[in-house]
């Protein structure tokens, strides 16, 4: 039986030549989001959405695959030049930044915006393994 046609609006192709890549590297996952200069999301990808599960999500290779996926989607929308904001202590920071450059995007700047507490909340207790 034929499936009914999907109604609703199709994703329109934007032409955004300059944008910002936000890389959030946590201990468990890496999230890459490409936005325009106003902050509207153009494309995104995560290590988990790229097919990695469990502890493999936190590897540099998973971050590289996610960054390449998000960068290619952003290039399809016309993005050529990008600035990178990096946040978090994860292992995928460097791999994600390198992957964005290797896809063919021109990187304007790299800025670390990891939030640092001025003696705010008490940190979690140390792990004893």
Swiss-Prot record:
A GO CC annotation given for this chain:
ribonucleoprotein complex
Single GO molecular function = rRNA binding
- Which Cys-Cys disulphide bridges does the record give? none
**Any stretches that span the bilayer, and where are they?**
none
Query: What biological process terms from GO does the record include?
Result: translation
Q: What keywords would UniProt list here? A: Ribonucleoprotein, Ribosomal protein, RNA-binding, rRNA-binding
PROSITE patterns per UniProt: RIBOSOMAL_S11 (PS00054)
Tell me the subunit arrangement. Answer: Part of the 30S ribosomal subunit. Interacts with proteins S7 and S18. Binds to IF-3.
Q: Which family does it belong to?
A: Belongs to the universal ribosomal protein uS11 family.
Cited function: Located on the platform of the 30S subunit, it bridges several disparate RNA helices of the 16S rRNA. Forms part of the Shine-Dalgarno cleft in the 70S ribosome.
The name under which this protein is listed is Small ribosomal subunit protein uS11
What lineage, starting at the top, does this entry show? Bacteria, Pseudomonadati, Thermodesulfobacteriota, Desulfovibrionia, Desulfovibrionales
What gene is this protein translated from? Answer: rpsK
């Amino acid at each position: 039986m034929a499936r009914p046609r999907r109604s609703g609006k199709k994703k329109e192709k934007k032409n955004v030549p300059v944008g910002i890549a936000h890389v959030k590297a946590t201990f468990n996952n890496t999230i890459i989001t490409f936005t325009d200069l106003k902050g509207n999301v153009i494309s995104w990808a995560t290590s988990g959405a790229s097919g990695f599960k469990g502890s493999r999500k936190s590897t540099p290779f998973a971050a590289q695959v996610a960054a390449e996926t998000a960068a290619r989607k952003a290039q399809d929308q016309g993005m050529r030049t990008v600035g990178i904001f990096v946040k978090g202590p994860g292992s995928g920071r460097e791999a994600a930044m390198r992957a964005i450059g290797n896809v063919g995007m021109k990187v304007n700047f790299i800025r670390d915006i990891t939030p640092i507490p001025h003696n705010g909340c008490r940190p979690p207790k140390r792990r004893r393994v």
